[in-house]
Amino acid sequence: CTGWEVADHQALQAAREHLQKAGVEFEEGTPGELAERRVQELVRFRDPWDNVFELYHGITYESRPVVTPYAAKFVTGDQGLGHIVVPVLDDVEALRFYTEVLGFRLRDSMSMPGEFVGKEPGSKVWLRFLGVNPRHHSLAFLPMPNPSKCVHVMFEVDKLDDVGRALERVRKHGAPLSATLGRHMNDEMISFYVKSPGGFDVEFGTDGMTVDDSKWVARESTAVSYWGHVFGGQ
């Protein structure tokens, strides 16, 4: 389940009405769920591929900053927690749903051979990158089934040294590396990928791009990365 924050009660009510108009069923959060998440209101719904999302407002903020055991500072604030890549079955319908129903903005695209996701040879499928805040993308989708309902999640820190130290800990503890250190082409992030116990990948990186929607033009990337990111490599 992935949560998305809206401004206030009026914004959440507008989202309810928009979901109803689009024929998307949703349910209200229970008092226990509101207390657990420390929010004032939330609604929960599923996309056409059974990925679960929540919209909420009125989150309770701590007055003390989070200090991790390794003193890494995460890049959050108006960029949100990071990004998530979810599995879908139809990339055309997914683009329509996330942009027209949920209001995400297309930031970038990348085409892949259809056989990469089990489709007929010679066909093409699209990996799309969508945004709702200054972060280059907060949501992306890949037209490929995934039992965990998550392809990967990304967390960003503000220093390259913290990425390097995290990579050293991954190797020290024998966690399976899914992709080596590299710099992505679309959001320019320097990162690596590690396999989580839940079966999805965790991307850990720094130096991600931010965008200004008044000037941004959606693009197509022709490669995953400028360098590195050897998937399956150690």
Residue positions per predicted region:
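N-terminal beta-strand motif that seeds the catalytic metal site of vicinal oxygen chelate
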Residues: 1-2, 58-93, 105-107, 148-155, ...
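Vicinal oxygen chelate
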Residues: 1-77, 80-89, 116, 128-130, 145-171, 174-234, ...
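Core segments of cupin and vicinal oxygen chelate
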Residues: 86-137
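Residue-level signal for secondary-structure boundary sites
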Residues: 10-12, 138, 163, 202, ...
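A structural feature that tracks compact, well-ordered secondary-structure segments
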Residues: 1-3, 54-56, 96-99, 107, ...
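A compositional/structural signature marking long, glycine- and acidic/polar-rich segments
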Residues: 119-185
